[in-house]
C-alpha cells in the first residue's frame, strides 16, 4: 500500500511513524515545502525569548534522522499545488527549481496545517514585520531584535501565540504592546471575567494590552516604525502578526473536497468525502466531545492524537477519533492560564442550564515556602451536575487542575464523582483537600442552596448596586464597607437589618461563606457572598457621605494629585525623587497631603 502524506509537522509525522510501526510493508512518503520536519512549533516563542538557546533544540528530528528511525521517505522543499482525486495524484512543485511532477497514491493523507492569518493592510512587507510559524521565523525574529536593539514592539493578536510572544519579547527587554480586535484577550478561550483578571495582570507586569482595537495600517518606509490603529498610532520597531491562523488549504479549493471556511471536513475516522483521502491536524474540522457539534481546534496535542488515530484506521483497526475539548494552557509573566471544555457562554449557547463558580484556593499547603494560588472557574449543568468546563488561573501548575477536568469530562463525570476522589497529597504538592475538590464543594453548596453567591461577572455588571458591602476579612480592608469580625458574631449584628441586602466580602470567600451560614441562622434573609472575593474582584464601595466639594477637589489636584473617578473622595499621587532625596517644599506638600481627611 502506497500512502502519501502532505505536510510534515505534528499530524503528518505522527501519522507516518505510527503507520510504519503498524505495517512495515507500507510505502509511506511525507512531502513538505519546509526544510524542517517534526519541529516544536509550540516552542518557537521561547526560542525568541532566549529560554531555549539553540535552534537545533526545536527540531525533534531532522529529515534524515526521522527517515532512519521510522523507515518513512521524506521529501522536503516540495510544495503540493493541486489534488487530482480522480487520478489519485497530487501535483507537487519543487520550491527551488519550480519543476512540477505528479505523485501517485493508494491512500492520501492531508496534514497541511495552518499559517498565521495575513492582515489585509498596508505595510506587511516592511522590514521588522514578522509572523510566527517555523523555526526560521523564530530565528529571524530573535536575530532582528538583537541586531537592531529593538526597544518597542507591537503584537497583533491576544490569543495563545500572541501572548506567548509578548512574554518572551519582554524577557528580551522589549517594551511590548498587544492589541486585539476582540473585546477581551483570549477570545473564545476563556470567559470575560477571567480575561479581565489576566489583562490586569499583564498590565501590572509591564505588558500593555489594548482590546477592541483594529490595526488599520503598518507605518514605515523600508522598515516598520509604527502601527496605525483605531486607538491611535503605536510606535514600534518590531511587529508580530499573530491575529489567528488559517488552514493551508488554498490549493484544494477546486479538488472536490468538502470544506468549511478553509477547513477540511472529516468523519470520525478522519476520512474526507473523497475516496481514499484522509486529513488530520490543524487543517481539519473535527467535533466537540461535549456537544458533538463541529469545532476547529488547531492544537499540536490534538494533531498528534488525530494522526495516531488515523494511522490505526489506515492499517485496519476499527477506531474513531472522539473529538476535542479545546484543552489549552498558556504561560504569562508570573501567571499561567489553563482551560478545557465549554466556556460559560458556549455552554449556554449549547442549551445547557448553566451554573458556575469562581473559587480562589491555595495550590499547596499555605505554609510551604513556594505556595501559590489557583483561581478555578467551574462550569456545570445545573440539573444533571455534569461537568462542562473549567478555567484556571495561577502562578503554578494549573495544568494539573485542567487535566483532572479533562479526564472527568471524558468519562462523563458529574460533580459528585469528584467529592471523594483520592488525589495525591503532601505539603510540597497540594492541599489536604485537593484544590479541584474544594472548587467542586463550593459549586455543590451553591447548587443545593447552602451558599447564595454573586458571580464576578454579575458584580462587574452592577448587580451589587443595591447591596450594603460587609467586609469579613481578618482586618478591615474595604474602604467604606461595614466591617464585621467573624469571631465575634454570635447573634444579630447591630447596624445590619435582617431584610437588608448584604454583600459579604472577604479575602478569598471562605469567611464570607462562614458569616452567611451564621447570619442565615439568625434570621438574615438577603445575604450574598461575592465569589472570588477580593482576591479576584476589584471591590469598591461608593461613598455617599464623604463627598469632596469642587473647591476641595481643585485644591487637592493643585498639589499634583489625580482624582480616582471610581470614588467620590479618593485621590492618587506619585512622588518622584532624585537619588532618593526630596526638597523641603516637596516634603511640605507630601505632609500636607497626608493630613487630608
Regions found by a protein language model. Name each.
Residues 1, 8, 283-396, 428-431, ...:
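Mid-to-C-terminal Rossmann-like scaffold of FAD/NAD(P)H-dependent oxidoreductases
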Residues 1-75, 79, 160, 166-190, ...:
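Beta1-alpha1 glycine-rich phosphate/pyrophosphate-binding loop at the start
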Residues 25-27, 69, 75-96, 103, ...:
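A Rossmann-like FAD-binding core segment of flavoenzymes
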Residues 110-172, 208, 261, 266-268, ...:
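Glycine-rich dinucleotide-binding loop and its adjacent helix/turn
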Residues 125-149, 219-226, 233-309, 404, ...:
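FAD-site-proximal beta/loop scaffold in flavoenzymes
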Residues 420-423, 427, 431, 438-452, ...:
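Rhodanese-like catalytic fold shared by cysteine-dependent sulfurtransferases
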